[in-house]
Curated annotation (Swiss-Prot):
Fe cation 1 binds at D142, E173, H176. This is Ribonucleoside-diphosphate reductase subunit M2. The keyword Zinc-finger does not apply. Its EC number is 1.17.4.1. GO terms for cellular component: cytosol; ribonucleoside-diphosphate reductase complex. Its cofactor is Fe cation. The active site is at Y180. Provides the precursors necessary for DNA synthesis. Catalyzes the biosynthesis of deoxyribonucleotides from the corresponding ribonucleotides. Binds 2 iron ions per subunit. Belongs to the ribonucleoside diphosphate reductase small chain family. It comes from Drosophila melanogaster. One of its GO terms (biological process) is deoxyribonucleotide biosynthetic process. Keywords: Cytoplasm, Deoxyribonucleotide synthesis, Iron, Metal-binding, Oxidoreductase, Phosphoprotein. InterPro entries: Ferritin-like_SF (IPR009078), RNR-like (IPR012348), RNR_small (IPR033909), RNR_small_AS (IPR030475), RNR_small_fam (IPR000358). The gene is RnrS.
Length: 393
């Protein structure tokens, strides 16, 4: 493990040189004026004011982190001279999560988009606007998750099993980001609009708001490891949930088979990543207080609700905004239960088509049809692979 001094040096370098730090310090007044699609000046001004508000909210949330935290007391974080070798496995539950992630590997080339363009051209303008902007958010968000994994979690966590998972998660987030980029490249033929969507963090205040919240946790020097685990569980478990649900709504209508299949694969992966965050939280000795956890989750819920009911309302594709807001609260409650906090919203799932989707911190989705898409034998016991002559034919 690197010394504490080296970690401090690395964090100082991050604060000066990281691309995410540059994004965080950009003034929202410098958001470029765009005239593409539905981005009218009035809406842009409205969203910009909202972004300014969340910037202050996120910063104030960071400043509230005053709970003493000693990394040397945490088995996950203390120096581990055996971190360069994998065996013998010390944390079998963490290792099994890594093997499950490894078994679920897939590539962009395995998703067939040949039938999507026909549906794309049949969609209404509002529907195309909504889908393209959701894809723009996704394309940027996976890069932000990786920024956190590379700059913070992978450097802080010292147990080999967790490092294996984070390494594989980084690879899968790259696949997700590539998938969303390919989808945008396939559906959007206008090069100027493509550029606008690929730069969503700078061009779309609604996306910037969510990005700034996540990035502020990466760059924070006051938030402890436990709080940041909660924040990124919220990013992958709450920030993605409504957008996943909106794309599954299209599947319910029999539209865009390539988009909806990739959404199944990615939502399964993100469900597993959220599960892993919960598992890491359970291994912590110094956990954030219940009130602090609720505060972080409530903040994430408010941002996601605003995103899909105001900035990019789901009624553009025929969904009910009130039900979407309720669904986000339902997802947050399921995450809070996994964290041992208990429900605070007590809302039911309003979308029956989402019953089996792993956005709630559970891995049951991994077991259903799309979850069977896994590498053969990766999660099985090697001792089960025995040659025999007494098999029935």
């Amino acid at each position: 493990m690197a010394s504490k001094e080296n970690i401090a040096d690395n964090m100082e370098k991050f604060s000066l040189k990281s691309p995410s730090k540059k994004i965080l310090t950009d003034s929202t007044n410098n958001v470029r004026k765009m005239s593409i699609g539905h981005e009218a000046n009035g809406q842009l001004a409205k969203e910009s004011s909202t972004v300014n508000g969340i910037g202050k909210s996120a910063n104030s949330l960071m400043e509230k982190s005053v709970t003493p935290f000693d990394p040397s007391l945490e088995p996950l974080l203390r120096e581990n001279p055996r971190r360069f070798v994998i065996f013998p496995i010390q944390y079998h539950d963490i290792w099994q999560m890594y093997k499950k992630a490894e078994a679920s590997f897939w590539t962009v080339e395995e998703v067939d988009l040949s039938k999507d363009l026909t549906d794309w051209h049949r969609l209404k303008d509002d529907e195309r606007h909504f889908i393209s902007h959701v894809l723009a958010f996704f394309a940027a968000s996976d890069g932000i998750v990786n920024e956190n994994l590379v700059e913070r979690f992978s450097q802080e966590v010292q147990i080999t099993e967790a490092r294996c998972f984070y390494g594989f998660q980084i690879a899968m987030e790259n696949v997700h980001s590539e998938m969303y980029s390919v989808l945008i490249d396939t559906y959007i033929r206008d090069p100027h609009q493509r550029e606008y969507l690929f730069n969503a963090i700078e061009t779309m205040p609604a996306v910037k708001r969510k990005a700034d919240w996540a990035l502020s946790w990466i760059s924070s020097k006051s938030a402890n490891f436990g709080e940041r685990i909660i924040a990124f569980a919220a990013v992958e478990g709450i920030f993605f949930s409504g957008s996943f649900a909106s794309i599954f709504w299209l599947k319910k209508r029999g539209l865009m088979p390539g988009l909806t299949f990739s959404n199944e694969l990615i939502s399964r992966d993100e469900g597993l990543h959220c599960d892993f965050a919960v598992l890491m939280f359970q291994h912590l000795v110094q956990r954030p207080k219940r009130e602090r956890i609720i505060e972080i989750i409530r903040d994430a819920v408010a941002i996601e609700q605003e995103f899909l009911t105001d900035a990019l309302p789901v009624n553009l594709i025929g969904m009910n905004c009130d039900l979407m807001s309720q669904y986000i609260e339902f997802v947050a409650d399921r995450l809070l239960v996994e964290l041992g906090v208990g429900k605070i919203y007590n809302t039911k799932n309003p979308f029956n088509f989402m019953e089996m989707i792993s956005l709630d911190g559970k891995t049951n989705f991994f077991e259903k049809k799309v979850g069977e898409y896994q590498r053969m034998g990766v999660v099985s016991n090697p001792l089960d692979n025995v040659f025999t002559l007494d098999a029935d034919f």
